[in-house]
């Protein structure tokens, strides 16, 4: 039985899909966590919820995030974008910074990334789910940043 549901919002305007569709086996196989993918159609990446930026990769392609509700997240922009060494990304936050839902985290150069990365498909993951927490996708297709993307249902633990 579900005792709590945590809603996670979209950090990106774009096309949302099930994580299994990610063109990378580690993400598609949920080896790094569970969530969804969004292929950006707009350049701004925002905080999905109130929380704290835990880390920004030196290459600016990924941000570790802890929501105020306790979810550890990874916002990974594009596939193999680590190889671009930060080109195509402008970062507006730093490690340890507190942010509110909708605050700008990154800006991306969609044209540059499209030309230089294998895919813009961006995994949005919960990286440290408990056994009693399950992700449920809430939206597929065209989505707008700030609207619900997926839910994390917290189930009552069996005695």
Model-assigned labels for residue ranges:
Residues 1-159:
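Contiguous, well-folded functional domains in the mature portion of proteins
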